[in-house]
Amino acid sequence: MTVLKHFFFILLLTGCAVKSTQIKTVDEVDINRFMGDWYVLAHIPSYVEKNAFNAVESYKLNEDGSIATTFTFNEGSLDGPVKTYHPKGFIIPGTNNAVWGMQFVWPIKAQYKIAYLDTDYKITIVARDKLDYVWLMARTKTLPHDQMIKFRDMIKGMGYSLDNYREIEQE
């Protein structure tokens, strides 16, 4: 009977497994060029940001090599209440600065993979192997419609379902 219980428990756990893949990152990130403000133009959001408008992620390299991050957005509408979060980024050694651990709450560090970065450091896609969240960000508040479609399709090509994909209005 105990073996049967273990079998059903394992079956239950595997049935609840999160879809996962190995997201490919860019070869290298010049961390100093990556710092600064990024407008979040589209995402598959976490619970905290599901109603975000005017979302901006700002990065500043600390002397110790960690990354001070400020994530600001209006909740619910373009003029909704301002929400601000200050996670801390930690570059994972051996990744050429393309994989970070993003810490909102100690000691948990969420995976943050720079999956796309144009050569001008003006557009980036940050993804996760769990395929649960993704962020399309740019140095400008908008991109032409054809580029938005191109990057949405790129995200889908990484293995993401677009069911919860959402473009973010910027003012």
Language model region names:
Residues 16-171:
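A beta-rich soluble binding module of mature secreted/lumenal proteins
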Residues 4-14:
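Sec-dependent N-terminal signal peptides
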